[in-house]
Amino acid sequence: MKRTYQPSRIKRKRTHGFLARKKTAGGRKVLKNRRRKGRWRLAV
């Protein structure tokens, strides 16, 4: 059986990266909440 996690830097950045978050309203909300919480890392 193939494992579910097949790491790929490109996929990682495209789906969870900062620019991907910035693009959508929901993503911007995520960034806002993470900033407010004081997360050391906002996006991947």
UniProtKB/Swiss-Prot annotation:
Keyword Ribosomal protein (UniProt): yes
Gene Ontology, cellular component aspect: ribonucleoprotein complex; ribosome
Listed PROSITE patterns: RIBOSOMAL_L34
GO molecular function annotation: structural constituent of ribosome
Region (Disordered): 1-44
Xref: NCBIfam families: rpmH_bact (TIGR01030)
Family: Belongs to the bacterial ribosomal protein bL34 family.
Protein name: Large ribosomal subunit protein bL34
Organism this protein belongs to: Thermosipho africanus (strain TCF52B)
Gene designation per UniProt: rpmH
